Amino acid sequence: MRHRVKKKHFDRTKEQRLALYRSLARALIFDERIETTVERAKALRSFIEPLVELAKEGTLHARRQALSRLPDKPAIKKLFEDIAPRFEGRNGGYVRIIKLPYRRRGDGAEMAIIEWVE
C-alpha cells in the first residue's frame, strides 16, 4: 500500500524517472547551473545532495557507491575532484533553487534555476 508515501512521479516509470534524475544531475555537474521546472529542481536536489556527501568522503567505496547511482565516470570525477572540495566546511544545502519570474511558454510550468552554492 502507498498510504502517505509522497514522491513526484512526473508521469514516468521508475526507470524513466531515474534516467531524468541522472540526466539533470549530469547537466548540473558539468554546467554548474541549469534552468528547469521548479518540481524537477526540487527532485534533483534530493538526488544530488547525497552524491555530494559521498564525494566529500572521498573514499574508493564512496566513489563506487556514487557510480552506482550516477554511472558516468567523467561526471563522478568532476564531482569528487572539483565540486566536493568547495563544500568541506558545509553540512548540507549544496544547491540553491531560484524561482524565475516567468513561466514556460508551452505549458505555463513554473521555472527555476538550480545552481551550486558557492
Swiss-Prot record:
It comes from Aquifex aeolicus (strain VF5). This is Large ribosomal subunit protein bL17. Part of the 50S ribosomal subunit. Contacts protein L32. Keywords: Ribonucleoprotein, Ribosomal protein. Gene3D superfamilies: Ribosomal protein L17. SUPFAM superfamilies: Prokaryotic ribosomal protein L17 (SSF64263). Belongs to the bacterial ribosomal protein bL17 family. One of its GO terms (molecular function) is structural constituent of ribosome.
